[in-house]
């Protein structure tokens, strides 16, 4: 999957004008959600059990593999990358060479990002790391928290997480459109503040289950969509044609490292302070993420939007 996912995601950025990449990333997230839904459905219908009670997952794995092969076949047969890149450069969405945030400078014979742009890239990556440290800690340990704290906690926890997922999926496309209007950085800050509010409410009110927690997790789902739809395109904005894949690798390195480290870190806090430390832990890291994203001066899109949603793709054959 490490060889499959980053190039597939980078391909979208390669063929999409920079100001439209938030919308493009929203579509990617939406399709990822559909893929997850497909797998959940197949887990229900494709897993069989023999007389001894042993589960057979062959059909499940075959169905998922078949979907991936089908997707690759469609990609190979329908996507003409060079043609699409040429069309994208022809459109260029009003971004001239002087405005290109991925423009490099030559130092000692090597191409490097200007220091202000490099600083912004590091700040954006720091934001991504802090976000995943906070958000993934809560989503990873929430089921354990609910099971230990509430009566019937597992069922309630599963529903809360499902509500968050549905809210995120429903928000992807609208958030992509809103981001084109108000800018990616502003949308990320809105998402971080919204997540912080949700975690703050849960800190004081989640010791007993109540249906209002579904609202809290719907808010958190919206926040997750706001951040993930826009942080990736901010990294891409600093890239240039030909090195989008490298910057995609930067994003995945930081995000996956944070997701790997945070269960260990939050586990230490929960062991020392108890389950009630879960939401404050997430709250602290989400609030910290507001600092670097507010300091980043590059990576935002130009908020001017086309008169028609399809205008940017209206090119002559």
What are these regions (language model features)?
Residues 83-126, 309-317:
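Juxtamembrane intracellular "pre-TM" segments in multi-pass secondary transporters
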Residues 193-207:
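C-terminal ends and interior cores of transmembrane alpha-helices
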Residues 22-44, 252-262:
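Glycine-rich segments within core transmembrane alpha-helices of 12-TM secondary carriers
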Residues 45-67, 268-286:
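A membrane-interface helix-boundary motif in multi-pass transporters
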Residues 3-16, 226-240:
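Intracellular juxtamembrane helix-capping segments at the cytosolic ends
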Residues 18-28, 154-155, 239-251:
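Loop-to-transmembrane helix entry/capping segments in MFS-fold secondary transporters
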Residues 140-156:
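Short amphipathic helix-loop junctions that connect adjacent transmembrane helices
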Residues 171-184, 270:
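Helix-to-loop junctions at the C-terminal end of transmembrane segments
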């Amino acid at each position: 999957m490490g060889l499959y996912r980053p190039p597939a995601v980078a391909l979208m950025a390669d063929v999409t004008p920079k100001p439209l990449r938030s919308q493009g990333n929203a579509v990617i997230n939406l399709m990822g959600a559909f893929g997850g839904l497909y797998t959940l459905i197949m887990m229900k219908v494709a897993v069989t059990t023999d007389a001894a009670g042993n589960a057979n997952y062959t059909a499940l794995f075959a169905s998922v593999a078949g979907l991936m092969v089908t997707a690759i076949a469609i990609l190979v047969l329908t996507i003409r990358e060079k043609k699409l890149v040429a069309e994208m450069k022809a459109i260029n969405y009003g971004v001239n060479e002087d405005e290109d945030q991925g423009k490099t400078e030559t130092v000692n014979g090597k191409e490097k990002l200007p220091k202000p742009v490099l600083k912004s890239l590091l700040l954006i990556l720091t934001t991504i790391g802090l976000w995943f440290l906070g958000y993934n800690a809560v989503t990873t340990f929430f089921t354990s928290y609910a099971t230990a704290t509430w009566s019937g906690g597992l069922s309630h926890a599963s529903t809360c997480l499902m509500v968050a997922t549905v809210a995120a999926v429903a928000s992807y496309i609208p958030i992509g459109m809103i981001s084109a209007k108000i800018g990616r950085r502003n949308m990320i800050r809105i998402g971080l503040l919204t997540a912080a509010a949700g975690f703050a409410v849960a800190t004081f009110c989640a010791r007993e289950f109540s249906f209002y927690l579904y609202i809290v997790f719907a808010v958190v789902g919206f926040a997750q969509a706001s951040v993930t739809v826009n942080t990736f395109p901010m990294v891409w904005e600093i890239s240039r044609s030909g090195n989008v894949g490298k910057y995609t690798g930067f994003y995945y390195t930081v995000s996956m490292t944070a997701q790997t480290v945070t269960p260990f870190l939050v586990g230490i806090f929960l062991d020392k302070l108890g389950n009630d430390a879960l939401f404050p832990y997430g709250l602290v890291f989400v609030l910290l993420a507001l600092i670097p994203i507010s300091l980043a001066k590059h990576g935002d899109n130009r908020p001017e939007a086309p008169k028609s949603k399809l205008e940017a793709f209206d090119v002559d054959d």
